[in-house]
Amino acid sequence: MPQVSRDRDVDCAPMKNESVLFQPRTNQFCLLNATATFLWNQLDQPRSVSELADRLCQHFDSVMLAGATRDVEKLIEELRSLGYVVSSEV
């Protein structure tokens, strides 16, 4: 099952309910909302989309698994395309 984790070169600046990511290889910034920041914080080690979706549902009571899975897939794909996360096979 593919897993994803942070690119170790990316810097993260936490703010009140958000975070700003900086990818030094591309000089690109990315602003994360509270939900995306929660997921980013889970990526300190490799995790699967299903594991991230489960954690999201546990953290936010009103989130349903199907919606969480879609949202996680979308966020991970965007972060991967911008070089903020890396994938690995387990």
Predicted regions and their residues:
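Long, low-complexity, charged/polar intrinsically disordered regions in eukaryotic proteins
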Residues: 1-27
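Long, charge-rich, low-complexity alpha-helical segments
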Residues: 25-90
